[in-house]
Amino acid sequence: MEDRTPVTFYVGLHDLFVRLIERYPGKPIVIATPLHRLGETCINGECKPKEVGTLLDYVQAIRRVAEHYSLPVLDLFAVSGLQPSIDMLREKYMPDGLHPNDAGHRILAQKIIAFLETC
C-alpha cells in the first residue's frame, strides 16, 4: 500500500494503526482527518506541489491506510463545513485560518458526536 520506505508518512500511518490495533484489541478505534486550512495547497510558503505533498495528499493517505485496516474515518476535511478560504467562515470560525475558535469547536463537537454514535 503506497510507499513504505522507512521515512514516509505512509509508513508512519501503518505503524501507528497496527500499534493501536494491537494495543487495544476489540476496542473501537476511529481516525480523523485534519481540517482545511488557509494556504493548504502551499508548502513552506510556496504554492506549488513539492516532494512532500499538499495537505490533500496527507488526507488521502490517511483515508487509504485507515481503509486498509478497516478503521472508520471521520473525514473532517470533507464534512466539517469549516473552509477558511471563504472569508465569512474564516472570520466566524477559524480567525487564524487554521485553528477553530469556540464557535468552530462547537461545530466540530456536533460532527464528532454524530460520527461516534454511528460507530
Positions of the model-derived regions?
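Alpha-helical cap/lid subdomain in secreted, periplasmic
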Residues: 1-119
